[in-house]
Amino acid sequence: MMTGLSPKTHGDRVYSDRMEMPDVPTLAETFRKNGYQTMAVGKLHVYPQRNRIGFEDVILAEEGRYELGAVDDYQIWLGEHGYLGKEFLHAMGNNTYYTRPWHLDEQAHPTNWVTMEMMHQIKRKDPTRPFFFYCSYQFPHPPLVPLSTFLDMYQEEELEEPIGQDWLDDSYIFKAMCEAAGIYTEKEIKRARRAFFAQCTHIDYQIRLLIGTLRESNLLDDTILVFTSDHGDMLFDHNMVAKRCFYENATCVPLILSGKPLENYRGTVEKKLGTSYSKTGQFAI
């Protein structure tokens, strides 16, 4: 989305943690060169981690990826507030689907922290310039460690069972793709789905705070809000997890545009196939 390039062009075809960004103009750089104040808060997932990819500044929360050579701003904040080294004491992995409630204070949850930092930047905005702000939440991606407040909302909900299938049981490729999900019991799968939905609801509540901050800063009426994601999650549908295939749950992500400047388009639905890199030109128009 930031480069407007397909994997065929930018070269990262297999998810490479240590592949540097291509030397091309980015979406953030384009906005900045056209007079916009630019800021990113949350997860950028680029290498090296402190590469600002065209933003004037970034405040990072990168899921504790110490092996990539940088300490992010969330880790620094944890250390300053008595939580040094405690982020992963919940013992849940970044790519597993076991779950438990968040183990630290609510303010220390990455979703809350990213929201507060973004609210601060909205309040600190230069009043003489338009702005392009990027707020990126790492959740609901595992680890599945929701706040108990939101997990409790789903304890009594009868959730739909994962979609199953058996017509490819003799396919070696399909069996290999299902191995990652096959280690979980039926009870663990139900817990994982509840936790995933709870983390989505948590973000919904935090977005309310961001919208409220825009409103009280007299910015909401002139702001276009864009809600999107990089990928979905199979969440045990078809006996799979994560994003290893081109089934709908993994590839069909939201692209919702909202705001008073788009009032004439309220309720419009575009059903054409789109991609992450096709968003770049739309945002920059």
Residue ranges and their predicted role:
Residues M1-I285:
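Formylglycine-dependent sulfatase
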